[in-house]
Amino acid sequence: MDRAVSRVALENEEREAKNTWRFVFRIAILLLIVITLAISAAALVYSMEASTPGDLVGIPTVISRAEEKITSALSSNQDVVDRIYKQVALESPLALLNTESVIMNAITSLSYQINGAANNSGCGAPVHDPDYIGGIGKELIVDDASDVTSFYPSAFQEHLNFIPAPTTGSGCTRIPSFDISATHYCYTHNVILSGCRDHSHSHQYLALGVLRTSATGRVFFSTLRSINLDDNQNRKSCSVSATPLGCDMLCSKITETEEEDYSSVTPTSMVHGRLGFDGQYHEKDLDVITLFKDWVANYPGVGGGSFIDNRVWFPVYGGLKPNSPSDTVQEGRYVIYKRYNDTCPDEQDYQIRMAKSSYKPGRFGGKRVQQAILSIKVSTSLGEDPVLTIPPNTVTLMGAEGRVLTVGTSHFLYQRGSSYFSPALLYPMTVNNKTATLHSPYTFNAFTRPGSVPCQASARCPNSCVTGVYTDPYPLIFHRNHTLRGVFGTMLDDGQARLNPVSAVFDNISRSRITRVSSSRTKAAYTTSTCFKVVKTNKTYVLSIAEISNTLFGEFRIVPLLVEILKNDGV
């Protein structure tokens, strides 16, 4: 019994001893952990100089600055990426497309000639210097932001004069017509031996050439082929166009005054001619009895034509036969265009009555003077498949001289301000199936022409008159969406007299600083302007061909004025 009690007591003592040592061990371990943590914390504070909460206040600001630097760097990189994308995806393909277009035009021209070699059309198509590739017939200035009138013409530049001048006091050179394609240019004017008022006999000078760049970098026009048509055929009011087969020309043949022609009952004779690359000229009479069956007088617009969709398009105007189908369909039609910020004070009914009467001026016996466009297929056969388009007079004013232009993918018709509206007009033109459609025009309020009262330069109300002068605008500045912003032109800056020729860039309201040809009393007449670019130097030039008074040798001398387009970056 005692032995059993002793064993139990011994076991209890052993259990208590184990519990005591276990407790001591646990305390020791906890103390060791605490000491280790304390030493580690002290070491960390010492080695890292750990900040107190007060020291951490500026950290968000530092982080924000770092974020800004990173964002700025990323933005800068994005600008670089955008520029690379623009160059690779937009500009380079466009430049290649322009080059391809020029090459294809040249190949087309050569193809036409090769196919026509058997018909003696000639071979050896000329081509402008490579410096001009992509700089002819293009949208030369595309700018949405700059003020149009911050662009302006330089002083006139000396260059090679490619236009023959009169050689006697009674000689007269008048009515210049010019057109340029991607491969060559065409020029023509009328030559009268016995004064500018002689309507019975004249020559027609016609030339074909190319743009060159001299060794010193100067622009010049090089005539390669020319002919003086002196054959007792009195060609008048000629329009010229550069086509793949050479220089196509449309002329009327007349032996009477304009007033007498309007009094006749038959259409005016017309010819389609061509100066080939071989220097040979051929022409063919058009069947005007069929083509102009509703007309008593019909003339080319004197301004250049344009090669579009394998056809050449010429401006035409003249008098309609009273009560003919073409005349009847226009009866009651009219359009009124208004000056910028200068409205006509006349009653609306009176304005409408005067606008309707403006199409039938008394000078031409009350005949309706109509605008039109003639297109002819370009082939080795002249005068092939002619088609006449007569636009409605709800769009066009009284018929007048004009010009058909192509710039980029856009086509335009310029109409001389022979009626009451003085500011220059450019009608957008679309072509389809051999015919043309004209749309509401761009107007340039500061680009006026002189005229007789009540249709002087400042006129603002509809009236019946035949006045003005041919001074065409050339589309120069475009929006990126290809709509027109501004034009270049050489205008006669006088209210009533043909005086004071000045060149400028025009928007729809105002004009740039001007370049004056001479004094404000200098007499002048027709002007026609064409812009182009020397791609190598990225310089834009304008050839403005102007009739300037020349008292010693003939009444007028036709002068090819050349300017560079500059920009005032301060505007």
UniProtKB/Swiss-Prot annotation:
GO terms for cellular component: host cell plasma membrane; membrane; viral envelope; virion membrane. Residues 1-26 are intravirion. Disulfide bonds join 172-196, 186-247, 238-251, 344-461, 455-465. The keyword Disulfide bond applies. GO terms for molecular function: exo-alpha-sialidase activity; host cell surface receptor binding. The C-terminus (head domain) is involved in binding the cellular receptor. This is Hemagglutinin-neuraminidase. It comes from Newcastle disease virus (strain Her/33) (NDV). The gene is HN.
